[in-house]
């Protein structure tokens, strides 16, 4: 007799408690299909990071030795990255039958809202909010400090 491993996570019904976390493995449709075949009950799609947009725009701007286009590059790269992420999320959703959870990481409220809306529009079954702060200089930052900053 098989053991029933059904459970729920954040209100999502799962056939077992195994969830593939956001990683390079969960950004490929083929890998996600393989994970599902291997028995994974849900997939957290590779995160979209707002700070990656700023980093890439700054790198391009530095290479061209002009600062004024950085403003425009931020917007262009941001739209391009969001479009690619949405397409990937849509492809994973249409090729997998298990729940697909979108992982988003923003820096400001407007971006959080934009990314969350995009995930919902692409059919994500849930959202993982990736709270982090790459600018922490103090290694003694207390547990929960970063999270409280985002909530406030």
Cite the ranges covered by each PLM segment:
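Active-site entrance/lid segments in N-terminal catalytic domains of soluble metabolic enzymes
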Residues: 2-152
């Amino acid at each position: 007799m098989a053991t029933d491993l059904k459970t729920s996570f954040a209100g999502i019904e799962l056939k077992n408690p195994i969830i593939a976390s956001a990683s390079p493995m969960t950004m490929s449709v083929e890998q996600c299909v393989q994970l599902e075949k291997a028995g994974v009950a849900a997939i957290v799609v590779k995160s979209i990071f707002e700070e990656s947009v700023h980093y890439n725009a700054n790198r391009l701007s530095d290479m061209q030795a002009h600062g004024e286009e950085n403003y425009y590059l931020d917007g262009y790269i941001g739209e391009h990255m969001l479009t690619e992420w949405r397409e990937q999320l849509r492809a994973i959703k249409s090729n997998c039958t298990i729940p697909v959870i979108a992982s988003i990481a923003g820096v400001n409220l407007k971006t959080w809202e934009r990314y969350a809306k995009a995930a919902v529009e692409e059919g994500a079954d849930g959202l993982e909010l990736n709270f982090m702060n790459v600018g922490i200089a103090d290694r003694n930052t207390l547990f929960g400090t970063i999270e409280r900053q985002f909530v406030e």
